[in-house]
Amino acid sequence: ISPLKNDSPEFLNAEHFAIRPNTDTALMLSLAYILITNNSYDKDFINKYTVGFDSFASYVLGKKNNAPCTPEWASNITNIPIKKITNLAEKLITKKTMISMSWSLQRASRGEQPLWMGITLACMIGQIGTAGGGFGFGYSAVNSTGDSFTKIPWKSLPQGKNNIKDFIPVARITDMLEKPGETFDYDGQKFKYPDI
């Protein structure tokens, strides 16, 4: 899936989806819409490893803004035919799926959204942590995908001991500032926002 046909090596004989640049999130939202409406996403994975899926699903289905993220909606934005979108959704859940995204996606306006959506879609598929499944970023840019290489040690200064015990995920800074002292779930554990 790329505006450029030569993004994938020819030997893969891959089907090319000529997406309009910067519309990847719309495509993935429509794939999520299909998985939700077909009730074909991995509910066990979602319930065990994620927080907030009900709110996300409500958005995708158009319950919050009366704008469901249907394949028809996405096709108009992405230039990918509806049939290709629906077929791709089917393949996501019936085949081994690795969502590999280029780092270049985050260099656009609202560039965090395709990366967040890629992870969300990978969670819905439920193959994170399985051989050949899950998600990854920037594999095409590091020139060592699938190859072993020698790590060269970098010079660095000693770091010392970190005496800070409080922890919050960086994506929750706003929540911490707005809700000091409240608890939140992260990585299967409960934490408390510090009052700073």
What is each stretch, according to the model?
Residues 1, 25-29, 123-196:
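Extended redox/cofactor-interaction regions of prokaryotic respiratory oxidoreductases
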Residues 4-94:
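Long, well-ordered, tryptophan-enriched scaffold segments
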Residues 9, 27, 108-110, 145-146:
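Short helix/loop capping segments that flank catalytic or ligand/cofactor-binding pockets
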Residues 14-16, 95-99, 132-135, 195-196:
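Beta-sheet entry/capping signal
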Residues 42-43, 85-86, 98-100, 127-137:
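Acidic/polar loop patches that form or flank catalytic/metal-binding clefts of enzymes
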Residues 66, 86-98, 183-196:
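Glycine-rich phosphate/diphosphate-binding loops that line cofactor/substrate pockets in enzymes
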Residues 73-77, 102-110, 141-142:
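Conserved short loop/turn motifs at secondary-structure junctions
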Residues 113-123:
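Basic, amphipathic alpha-helical segments enriched in Lys/Arg and hydrophobic/aromatic residues
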